[in-house]
Amino acid sequence: MKTKTAFMAILFSLITVLSACGAGSQTTGAGQKKVQTITVGTGTQFPNICFIDEKGDLTGYDVELIKELDKRLPHYKFTFKTMEFSNLLVSLGQHKVDIVAHQMEKSKEREKKFLFNKVAYNHFPLKITVLQNNDTIRGIEDLKGKRVITSATSNGALVLKKWNEDNGRPFEIAYEGQGANETANQLKSGRADATISTPFAVDFQNKTSTIKEKTVGNVLSNAKVYFMFNKNEQTLSDDIDKALQEIIDDGTLKRLSLKWLGDDYSKEQY
């Protein structure tokens, strides 16, 4: 009887040890954090940055950078949630997403509500953009009496609004919600005279559309762009900064920029 009791005690101890080992398998290792799922809010209408390719896959510079961060941060699992650009910050504020990855520029209004990481991952040169056969608009100074179309709440919209207000509002600003294709169609139809874009977005547009565009004039903004978080995500932001700096230092960010944007926009050059 004593032998049976001793056997049962040993068996119970063994089961307890195995159960503890099983519970530990939910972490990435002894003393390490459990894997945390991070939902990344992004769009599908930004050429080269976040878009759906011919295979139906979400890809682009911002998307592939997040995938690279996913490889280097094993205690996080990054997943994507796509939506219209105008819904990104609303979703972030409602904690429906944890990060916004969509070439986001800092502004006082945004910094009041949200957190930006510290390490910039792109430099975003914005220029006035018109149809290739338009020789009358050579820069923003030529937009008097014109209609300029852009995405609401975008970096370009902020630049246009500020310039317009500082210069007596010489042109009308209109907003679209369907991305680059709608903008191009409005330019072609004459409903809009110009837009604001980047050289790499225009290059992609010209390769994939029959509506050809060009950038004109001086660079209006060469802002650095960052990821956006809620104010309580400082640890996540810091972890991303550490991995992002490694991606910059080993040349991976430059390679991503050359592949998706056609030049090295990982550093300021305009």
UniProtKB/Swiss-Prot annotation:
The alphabetized UniProt keywords are:
Amino-acid transport, Cell membrane, Lipoprotein, Membrane, Palmitate, Signal, Transport
Main subcellular location of this protein, as a coarse class: membrane
Protein name from the UniProt record: L-cystine-binding protein TcyK
Q: Which residues form a coiled coil?
A: none
- One GO CC term, this protein: plasma membrane
For this protein, the record's InterPro entries field holds: Solute-binding_3/MltF_N (IPR001638)
Lipid attachment locations (N-palmitoyl cysteine): 21
Q: How does it assemble?
A: The complex is composed of two ATP-binding proteins (TcyN), two transmembrane proteins (TcyL and TcyM) and two solute-binding proteins (TcyJ and TcyK).
List the membrane topology term(s).
Lipid-anchor
**Which residues are the lipid attachment points (S-diacylglycerol cysteine)?**
21
Gene from which the chain derives: tcyK
UniProt GO BP:
amino acid transport
Q: What does this protein do?
A: Part of the ABC transporter complex TcyJKLMN involved in L-cystine import. Is also involved in cystathionine, djenkolate, and S-methylcysteine transport.
